[in-house]
Every structure is written in structure tokens, then in C-alpha cells.
A protein has these predicted regions:
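Ser/Thr-rich, low-complexity intrinsically disordered terminal regions
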Residues: 17-155
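Sec-dependent bacterial lipoprotein signal peptides
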Residues: 1-18
Length: 155
């Protein structure tokens, strides 16, 4: 009985860690790829692939709202897609994931940049990582089937 009371008291005193998932993800580990495709075709392909992979769109906005200093040679048409937070229950806590997809296009070349944030929430702490190679590779592999890639860029 004493052990149970001690465990219960510890759980009561520790509480829960609060998880806050930002809409805008910093460019800590971006994945970038260029395609021979115009803006409209790239946008429709990206949206359909996100839906196919189980991601919901929360917001579509101009990236200039969040980033003012970045310049790219493909800045004629640009858009930031923010996915909805995707929770995954785990044994110890819950993992929350979100993606930002940046589209930059000029004429017949489009650049797709994916930023991924995973936050694992446990009773005591939150752990965040800015990459998920497997999920992003699945996204780009599916996009490669639809659009012809130019080259892989790394930063």
C-alpha cells in the first residue's frame, strides 16, 4: 500500500507536459527538391499527395508573412502550406507531427521545400526533432512519380 501511495503521489506531483506545435517551422533541416513543372500543377500534385498520405491542410499563406530575408531565384510564385497536427498515441505519451511545404515557382521550374517537426510528449517532458527522413522520402518518392525532378539540393 505504501508503494502504491508513493507512486500515486509522484504521478500527481509531476503533472503533464504541455505541447505547443507552431504553425511556422524554422528551416533547421529542410528537404529541398526541384521539379520541371509549373506552379499550378505542382500545387495540385502536392495537395493530392498530402491527402493521399493522410495529412490535412490547415493553412495556405504567403511565406513572406514568416520569412523576410530569404531570397530564391524561383520567387515569382510562392506559397506556404501548413499541415494540421497529426497525433500518434504511443505507450509512454503521444507524438505530434507537423509539416510545412514551401512552393516556389518560376515559369516551368518549381522548388518544393519540406520542413518536418515531431514533438513527443510524455508525462515529464517534451522532445522535439526537426527531421523525419522516412516520411519526407515517402512524400518526395510519390511526388517523383507525378512530376519530373531536376535535382536534389541539400543545405
Amino acid at each position: 500500500m505504501k508503494k502504491f501511495s508513493l507512486i500515486l503521489a509522484c504521478l500527481f506531483l509531476t503533472g503533464c507536459a504541455t505541447t505547443n506545435m507552431p504553425s511556422y517551422l524554422q528551416p533547421k533541416k529542410p528537404y529541398i527538391k526541384r521539379y520541371y513543372s509549373n506552379y499550378d500543377k505542382t500545387l495540385s500534385s502536392v495537395k493530392s499527395i498530402l491527402t493521399e498520405l493522410g495529412w490535412g491542410l490547415e493553412e495556405a499563406t504567403d511565406p513572406g508573412v514568416y520569412e523576410h530575408t530569404r531570397f530564391n531565384d524561383l520567387d515569382e510564385n510562392k506559397l506556404l502550406l501548413v499541415t494540421a497536427v497529426r497525433p500518434t498515441p504511443m505507450l509512454v505519451g503521444t507524438r505530434y507531427a507537423r509539416m510545412n511545404i514551401y512552393l516556389r515557382s518560376k515559369k516551368e521550374v518549381s522548388e518544393v521545400e519540406v520542413r518536418y517537426l515531431t514533438t513527443t510528449s510524455t508525462a515529464l517532458n517534451n522532445f522535439s526533432t526537426y527531421n523525419n527522413d522516412g516520411a519526407v522520402k515517402r512524400f518526395f518518392a510519390r511526388l517523383d512519380e507525378v512530376l519530373p525532378p531536376v535535382e536534389m539540393l541539400s543545405k
